[in-house]
């Protein structure tokens, strides 16, 4: 599988760099959106990103005007674009209607990012925020090209397939199966040894 904690960490680190949080005074306004609360991957996406961003929130360099920070508050049922759009329309009308700038949106994936982008198009007049995503959906890559989304995280299934072939060959040959993670995935009966492939950050500079 892919290293989903690293997906979130990559998104968080992108925002740190894009906002120059190490050097800039701030504060910067941030809003957060993740996926379905029943999807275990959300724990990794959200956890990886917040491990990076929480210190800046605690410091006051990042501010969340909506006050919605907890995973349960920022979840999106079924990862649905329309649900993401509806929530962000409410956030924008309640916190940004006076022209306050939204500086960044941590969106765990592209379907939620698209909902954010749709809400911004209809309900926002400030400077356009930096928005993250994941999956490199066609609509979102188009938005990256158009300057409406800063980045997405690409998980190359070819790399996944190649690793699966290598692992199956090892099993058939009676050799040791290559794994690089023996801590992350617990199915309730024990830890499942895994091989975590690395995702890639995609921006306007490398999307081709």
Whereabouts are the PLM-identified features?
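A residue-level marker of the well-folded mature domains of exported/periplasmic proteins
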Residues: 1-208
């Amino acid at each position: 599988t892919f290293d989903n904690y690293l997906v979130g960490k990559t998104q968080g680190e992108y925002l740190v760099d894009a906002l120059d949080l190490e050097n800039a005074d701030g504060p910067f306004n941030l809003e957060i959106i993740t996926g379905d609360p029943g999807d275990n991957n959300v724990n990794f996406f959200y956890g990886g990103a917040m491990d990076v961003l929480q210190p800046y929130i605690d410091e006051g360099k990042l501010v969340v005007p909506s006050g919605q920070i907890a995973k349960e508050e920022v979840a999106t049922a079924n990862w649905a674009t329309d649900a993401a759009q509806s929530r962000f329309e409410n956030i924008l009308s309640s916190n940004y209607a006076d022209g306050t700038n939204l500086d960044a949106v941590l969106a765990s994936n592209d379907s939620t990012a698209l909902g954010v982008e749709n809400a911004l198009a209809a309900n926002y007049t400030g400077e356009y925020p930096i928005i993250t995503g994941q999956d490199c959906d066609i609509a979102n890559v188009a938005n990256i090209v158009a300057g409406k989304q800063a980045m997405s995280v690409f998980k190359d299934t070819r790399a996944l397939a190649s690793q699966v072939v290598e692992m199956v060959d090892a099993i058939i040959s009676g050799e040791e199966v290559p794994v690089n993670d023996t801590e992350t995935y617990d199915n309730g009966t024990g830890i499942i040894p895994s091989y975590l492939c690395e995702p890639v950050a995609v921006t306007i500079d490398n999307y081709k």
